[in-house]
């Protein structure tokens, strides 16, 4: 289990750009590349998040708490919304949303590697002075990570 803080203007499954419409993915993998023969489909959680508003004519949907490409309204499954921005108001980055996440994976072995990463698409993450602001546009942080072992006989 862990707390995931989603900062800024995540766009969910689609970003609304007329070209190169790509999702903002967040990925959790168990044992990535440790066992190249094994099917990793059950050891991977791929989802999207959206901090966008949702109106009848404009709504950038997210997958969470389901796997991508499932569609839910923005901020579905959140624990807390409208937390402080990660950056000052000099950039348009949005608020922070907290998700308390619990995931389980089957595993047998003496060691485990858990990898958390994103595939964010940020073509417009440039401030008024032309400086790239990726962290302020879309980023995330993790807190309170707990790994538990449950033994089944």
Give the positions of each predicted feature.
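Short coil-to-beta strand junction motifs in C2/discoidin
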Residues: 11-30, 137-141
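A generic structural micro-environment signature
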Residues: 12-16, 36, 148
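Terminal, low-complexity interaction segments
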Residues: 56-57, 61-152
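Extracellular ligand-binding interfaces
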Residues: 19-81
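Predominantly extracellular/luminal cell-surface or secreted proteins
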Residues: 5-7, 29-33, 50, 117, ...
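Extended, low-complexity, turn-rich repeat/linker tracts enriched in Gly/Pro/Ser/Thr and Asp/Glu
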Residues: 5-22, 54, 122-125
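Alpha-helical protein-protein interaction elements
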Residues: 2, 18, 132-134
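Extended extracellular/luminal ectodomain segments enriched in beta-structured repeat modules
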Residues: 1-2, 6-9, 108-113
């Amino acid at each position: 289990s862990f707390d995931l803080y989603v900062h800024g203007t995540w766009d969910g499954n689609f970003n609304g750009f007329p070209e190169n419409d790509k999702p903002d993915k967040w990925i959790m993998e168990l044992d990535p590349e440790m066992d190249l023969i094994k099917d990793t489909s059950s050891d991977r959680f791929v989802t999207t998040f959206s901090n966008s508003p949702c109106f009848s004519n404009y709504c950038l949907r997210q997958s969470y708490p389901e796997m991508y490409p499932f569609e839910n309204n923005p901020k579905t499954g959140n624990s807390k919304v409208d937390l402080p921005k990660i950056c000052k108001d000099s950039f348009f980055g949005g608020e922070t949303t907290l998700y308390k996440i619990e995931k389980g994976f089957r595993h047998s072995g003496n060691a485990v590697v858990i990898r958390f990463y994103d595939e964010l698409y940020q073509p417009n993450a440039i401030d008024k002075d032309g400086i790239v602001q990726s962290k302020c546009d879309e980023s995330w942080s993790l807190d309170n990570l707990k790994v538990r072992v449950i033994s089944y006989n």
